[in-house]
């Protein structure tokens, strides 16, 4: 299994629709102002956060249970940025839609710009033949409110190509998050 380069990522996105919309370079500015970078890097792709968020709230004082998740635990928010309360988290989704090839697995890591501010981005791997918008989780580990930005980089996806094709892909086993289009809550 080997990590894939910018050249491979560009080819797969442009010829096979692996990432849509796709940015072949690294974008660091928008209208003359600095932003958190996104687009193709040497051995990965920096994804962007869309302007739709679900911010965790404890208003209903319920137990957080992944098997019986209460949708009232979140407040929906749309905007260019989102404030995450202290020691809380928010869900978002990517701007980009992904179609992962059958012989590829991705690992997604948070960007250091956010990590250095105490904001941790958590995303699970994108499995072979998974497709959809990625649901992102932003944890604010600080005792202060923290801001995240829509339309800017938030995490980096690394692509690994296997030496052999898997017997059963995410699509084959009917994965529960296949084809997700919005911020998707836990499914048991």
Swiss-Prot record:
Pathway: Pyrimidine metabolism; dUMP biosynthesis; dUMP from dCTP (dUTP route): step 1/2
Enzyme Commission (EC) number: 3.5.4.13
Keywords per UniProt: Hydrolase, Nucleotide metabolism, Nucleotide-binding
Catalyzed reactions per annotation: dCTP + H2O + H(+) = dUTP + NH4(+)
Entry superkingdom: Bacteria
Gene3D superfamilies: 2.70.40.10
Biological process annotations from GO: dUMP biosynthetic process; dUTP biosynthetic process; nucleobase-containing small molecule interconversion
Enzyme class, broadest EC rank: hydrolase
GO molecular function annotation: dCTP deaminase activity; nucleotide binding
Role of this protein: Catalyzes the deamination of dCTP to dUTP.
Assembly description: Homotrimer.
Protein name (record): dCTP deaminase
Organism in which the protein naturally occurs: Paracidovorax citrulli (strain AAC00-1)
